[in-house]
């Protein structure tokens, strides 16, 4: 198939750098954020005021990291750099100054791809969206149905201040949700006189009631107000004027305790039309008075006062890596400050040096805690390049300082008009996180204040001006202007064609003539996220299915031989490039050397640049990361050119699946309810074969009885089982292993108690110690098999850091090729997913007029009710493209080129395909898009013509191999004694209450009894049953289930006198073993069967 691609829709398809969100934020942290924090803590003085310690933040240094990225991954280390900062210790009494560079901790560094390497694993810090600090005005209904208004001043950190009105037109204030205080009490406590307040208000008469109320309470002076304030905020403590003053000062006017942040100051200035400089981060009298004034205007409904919508993106901001890290550094420095103050007090003043005062531990711990266990620091989703890219662009409302799943209502999760071009309205998880985790839209960027902006072209007098850079607007700014969507039709000179244009203005839709349009969106794609923008004909899909399509593309497994989609949207190249999976040339030059491991480019100055390629490495999700060169020796290359394909890439484009021939028709019920019928060709030609790499690890520990040993000498193991082990007892690379094979031989010393009596006897007689060790080798688990691709040995001698108590760690990587099989999940890009129900020989599949058998048969009933018609357009466009031997790029939302454009385009392509290929059956105008198929089994044509074409189908990561599981006996839960659940725990299948009802309805009493007792949690019964089976005896009667005893104990613990009685009224002691003849064996005893055992029957 030739690789010519036809671009159908011409619009702005260039995208900004898609990982910029992460990189820019971390750069800000290194340039400004860290310095800000260090300087805000400087100087630290001791309690007597004799010593001062200054951090000179602007002079901090980062050392070169100890390991590079690859080395850090290999050694399970953190890719981090040591931070040093210059400290100056000033002795106020003697005037002595000591300056010294001090180590303050390790800072993990971001890799070029926007990720962090923590303990050898790649992690991503997800962006968090939180309520912006500032002032918010809301209305509430009281219980009498009267509307009251309130104003909240929310800082970045510190106490909340809330003003509210009541039914008597009095103004109250609450500090941090405590009891209500008359607002004028706060004004007086702040030292404002009645006139100071009244002069600042536009409607002072409303406020006078609050002054009268304060006077009635006998609070007429500043001192009385301070006492009253102290009483309300600290009830139960003896009030004092100085205490009140200090309380007020520290709560709102101390920069250490109260911080609006740059954003908060900006928002307050904007809302209240103030001009306070943004260096003033605490509350001012002006802020408080303006807030009161605005609230009174709201109450009286004058002065253009408006309420705030907290779900508007102008009131929510994004905290990216840099800021989250800065907050964490602040926590660490707070702890450090306490330690420094204590050391200053305790130590000898004269001999103290900065290095003795500064202990790096608190800061190291705070940063480690953030990267290791914060909700926002996540194990990177590396299933394929798209999953990786989407993870870095994710925006979560959860996490510290954010919402919780249970508390989040419908309004927060819902799509808001201000999301346009900022957050994707489609891509979000299904389930409890829906709407709380979003994805950044394709063209969106985060500005310096943390608000999301999106680009527009300016429109002047009905002409779109596309020269120069587009203009980025935040959600606030956008509300004030009239914005037309990105798919308005324009002439070549940029003039808008239509007479009336639908525009968005103040979150509403109206139609205006072109002259009144202020801006037009950059591209139709800017509304949606990266994953969604890869879906062709998206506009024909229902949003719920497009959501599934977006999410399932992220779960596509990289295949052995990826293939680009026949029908794409034009964004595939950039997704592959920005994901960081494909190596890109850094210079203009010529390729001088290429092999599977490295590509060398010679630049114009004669310097060599070597690009090392990843070969068969394991990803976080056990998929395979592999890069294949696509340039040849002697090729000229330019800056930014793709040199090699990564996993799930082909020709520098993202290629998540395969283009396969699909027919929509029922086939013998095998595609009922979303099942798929597939051809054997997908298996034999390795179309959907993928490589998975599993990691197995074992450590040799130091035990009380001596060290464990990694060795070839394993007791009671036949020599043939050791065939693939080397002299150390470790499997050789390249060996093929199956379930139960030994990967690493290990023996553990056995204690005295572990020995059976006969061995103790031999020991007593011969006095010689047989080598008492037991086999503790690492074996291949149940359903796995594959080829060993790598073995890594870590020891202390080599300088590796090992877990405490371990002498040696061995890791074995096993790769397996998985062909597609029944039970695997597949999906298209439109949310059309299914499970393979049968693999049919290709001679039995329905075939085309030229004898080509189809690859997959889908159920046509999956389309109408789900309303994802995009799949049908893709099918037919793919059919035309394959017959024209080309690939097609169609940007979504193509009606800017005319009404019903998709249908026209597809029809044009199909007629063209029929003409050029010389096969008139390719397109039949009588049955457009349908062909007459014949049944592969009989050769007879089917009754009706069938829709056939090429579609891009993915194999998803939910593979049946990882799910299939069986158990005979296995571990039991400690309390209930029932089998555990899940494959990882070797668990059983849950027999829930509905299954019990089914068996009850059937009357299967004995089956039910043994399911609830012997096969579950009747401890004695199950051991006796197993013994009976082994000895061939009849199975004894079941006893009491353990969970019944637990229930009895629980009821007794509530103080209920509850017991079980026989029919004769005798109490049964459940805790006593039913069969007193012998104690229950902990495991079945396989005694040799004597003659007596047979005679009894």
UniProtKB/Swiss-Prot annotation:
Keywords: DNA-directed RNA polymerase, Nucleotidyltransferase, Transcription, Transferase. It catalyses: RNA(n) + a ribonucleoside 5'-triphosphate = RNA(n+1) + diphosphate. GO terms for cellular component: DNA-directed RNA polymerase complex. InterPro entries: DNA-dir_RNA_pol_bsu_ext_1_sf, DNA-dir_RNA_pol_bsu_external_1, DNA-dir_RNA_pol_su2, DNA-dir_RNAP_su2_dom, DNA-dir_RNAP_su2_hyb_sf, RNA_pol_bsu_bac, RNA_pol_bsu_CS, RNA_pol_bsu_protrusion. Residues 1072-1097 are annotated as: Disordered. It is an enzyme of class 2 (transferase). It holds the Pfam family RNA_pol_Rpb2_6. GO terms for molecular function: DNA binding; DNA-directed RNA polymerase activity; ribonucleoside binding. DNA-dependent RNA polymerase catalyzes the transcription of DNA into RNA using the four ribonucleoside triphosphates as substrates. In cyanobacteria the RNAP catalytic core is composed of 2 alpha, 1 beta, 1 beta', 1 gamma and 1 omega subunit. When a sigma factor is associated with the core the holoenzyme is formed, which can initiate transcription. This is DNA-directed RNA polymerase subunit beta.
């Amino acid at each position: 198939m030739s690789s010519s691609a036809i671009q159908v829709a011409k619009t702005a398809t260039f995208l900004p750098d898609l990982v910029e969100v992460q990189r820019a934020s971390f750069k800000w942290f290194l340039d400004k954020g860290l310095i800000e924090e260090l300087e805000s803590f400087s100087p630290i003085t001791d309690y007597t005021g004799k010593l001062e310690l200054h951090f000179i933040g602007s002079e901090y240094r980062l050392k070169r990291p100890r390991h590079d990225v690859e080395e850090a991954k290999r050694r399970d280390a953190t890719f981090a750099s040591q931070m040093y900062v210059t400290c100056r210790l000033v002795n106020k009494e003697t005037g002595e100054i000591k300056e010294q560079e001090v180590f303050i901790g390790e800072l993990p560094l971001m890799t070029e791809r926007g990720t962090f390497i923590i303990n050898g694993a790649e992690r991503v810090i997800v962006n968090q969206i939180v309520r912006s600090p500032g002032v918010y005005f809301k209305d509430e209904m009281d219980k009498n149905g009267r509307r009251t208004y309130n104003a909240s001043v929310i800082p970045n950190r510190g106490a909340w201040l809330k003003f509210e009105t009541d039914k008597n037109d009095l103004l109250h204030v609450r500090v941090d949700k405590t009891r209500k205080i008359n607002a004028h009490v706060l004004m007086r406590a702040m030292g404002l006189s009645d006139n100071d307040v009244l002069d600042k208000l536009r409607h002072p008469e409303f406020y006078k009631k609050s002054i009268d109320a304060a006077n009635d309470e006998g609070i007429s002076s500043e001192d009385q107000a301070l006492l009253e304030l102290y009483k309300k905020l600290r009830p139960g403590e003896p009030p004092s004027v100085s205490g009140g003053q200090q309380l007020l000062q520290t709560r709102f006017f101390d920069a250490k305790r109260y911080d609006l942040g740059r954003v908060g100051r900006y928002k307050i200035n904007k809302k209240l039309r103030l001009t306070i400089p943004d260096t003033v981060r605490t509350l001012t009298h002006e802020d408080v008075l303006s807030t009161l004034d605005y609230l009174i205007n709201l109450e009286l409904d004058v002065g253009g006062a408006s309420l705030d919508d907290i779900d508007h993106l102008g009131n929510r901001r994004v905290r990216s890596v840099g800021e989250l890290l800065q907050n964490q550094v602040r926590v660490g420095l707070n702890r450090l400050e306490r330690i420094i103050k204590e050391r200053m007090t305790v130590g000898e003043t004269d001999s103290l040096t900065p290095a003795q005062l500064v202990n790096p531990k608190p800061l190291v711990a705070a940063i480690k805690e953030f990267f290791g266990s914060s909700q926002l620091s996540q194990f990177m989703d590396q299933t394929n390049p798209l999953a990786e890219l989407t993870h870095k662009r994710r925006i979560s409302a959860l996490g510290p300082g954010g919402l919780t799943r249970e508390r989040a209502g419908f309004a927060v999760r819902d799509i808001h008009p201000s999301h346009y071009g900022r957050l994707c309205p489609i891509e979000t998880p299904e389930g409890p996180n829906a709407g709380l985790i979003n994805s950044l839209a394709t063209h969106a960027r985060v500005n310096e204040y943390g608000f999301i902006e999106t680009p527009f072209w300016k429109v002047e007098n009905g002409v779109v001006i596309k020269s120069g850079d587009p203009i980025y607007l935040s959600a606030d700014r956008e509300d004030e202007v009239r914005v037309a969507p990105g798919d308005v039709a324009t002439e070549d000179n940029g003039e808008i064609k239509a007479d009336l244009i639908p525009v968005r203005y103040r979150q509403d839709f109206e139609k205006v003539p072109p002259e009144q349009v202020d801006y037009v969106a950059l591209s139709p794609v800017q509304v949606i996220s990266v994953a969604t923008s890869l879906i062709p004909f998206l506009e024909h899909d229902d949003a719920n299915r497009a959501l599934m399509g977006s999410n399932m593309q992220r779960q596509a497994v990289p295949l052995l031989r990826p293939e680009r989609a026949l029908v794409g949207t034009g964004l595939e190249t950039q997704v592959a490039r920005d994901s960081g999976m494909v190596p890109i040339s850094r210079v203009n030059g010529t390729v001088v050397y290429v092999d599977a491991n490295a590509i060398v480019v010679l630049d114009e100055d004669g310097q060599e640049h070597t690009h090392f390629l990843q070969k068969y490495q394991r990803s976080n999700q056990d998929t395979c990361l592999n890069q294949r060169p696509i340039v040849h020796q002697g090729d000229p290359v330019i800056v930014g050119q793709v040199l090699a394909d990564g996993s799930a890439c082909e020709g520098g484009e993202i290629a998540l699946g395969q283009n396969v021939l699909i027919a929509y028709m029922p086939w013998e019920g095998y595609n009922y309810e979303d099942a798929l019928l597939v051809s054997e060709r997908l298996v034999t030609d390795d179309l959907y074969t993928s490589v998975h790499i599993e990691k197995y690890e074992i450590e040799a520990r130091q035990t009380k009885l001596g060290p464990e040993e990694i060795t070839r000498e394993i007791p009671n193991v036949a020599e043939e089982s050791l065939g693939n082990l080397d002299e150390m007892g470790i499997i050789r690379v390249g060996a093929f292993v199956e379930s139960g094979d030994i990967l690493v031989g290990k023996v553990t010393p056995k204690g005295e108690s572990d020995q059976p009596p006969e061995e103790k006897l031999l020991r007593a007689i011969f006095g010689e110690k047989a080598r008492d060790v037991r086999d503790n080798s690492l074996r291949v688990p149940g359903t796995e098999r594959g080829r060993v691709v790598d073995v890594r040995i870590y020891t202390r001698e080599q300088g590796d850091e090992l877990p405490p108590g371990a002498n040696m760690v061995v890791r074995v990587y096993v790769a397996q090729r998985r062909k597609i099989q029944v039970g695997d999940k597949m999906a298209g890009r439109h949310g059309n997913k299914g499970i393979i129900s049968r693999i049919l020989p290709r001679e039995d599949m329905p075939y085309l007029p030229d004898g080509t058998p189809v690859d997959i048969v889908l159920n046509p009933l999956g389309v109408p009710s789900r309303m994802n018609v995009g799949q049908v357009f893709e099918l037919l466009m793919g059919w035309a493209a394959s017959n024209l031997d080309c690939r097609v790029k169609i940007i979504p939302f193509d009606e800017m080129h005319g009404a019903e454009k998709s249908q026209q385009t597809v029809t044009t392509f199909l007629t063209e395909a029929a003409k050029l290929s010389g096969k008139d059956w390719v397109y039949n105008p009588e049955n457009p898009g349908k062909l007459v198929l014949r049944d592969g089994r009989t050769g007879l044509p089917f009754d009706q013509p069938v829709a056939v074409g090429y579609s891009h189908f993915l194999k998803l990561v939910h593979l049946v191999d990882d799910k299939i599981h069986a158990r005979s006996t296995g571990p039991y839960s400690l309390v209930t004694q029932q089998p555990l659940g899940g494959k990882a725990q070797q668990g059983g299948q849950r027999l829930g209450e509905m299954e019990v009802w089914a068996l009850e309805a059937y009357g299967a009493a004995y089956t039910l009894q043994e399911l609830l007792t012997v096969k579950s949690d009747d401890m004695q019964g199950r051991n006796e049953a197993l013994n009976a089976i082994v000895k061939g005896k009849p199975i004894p009667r079941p006893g009491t289930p353990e969970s019944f005893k637990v229930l009895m104990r629980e009821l007794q613990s509530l103080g209920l006198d509850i017991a079980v009685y026989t029919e004769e009224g005798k109490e049964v002691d459940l805790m006593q073993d039913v069969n007193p003849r012998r104690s229950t064996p902990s495991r079945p005893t396989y005694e040799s069967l004597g003659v007596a055992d047979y005679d009894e029957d």
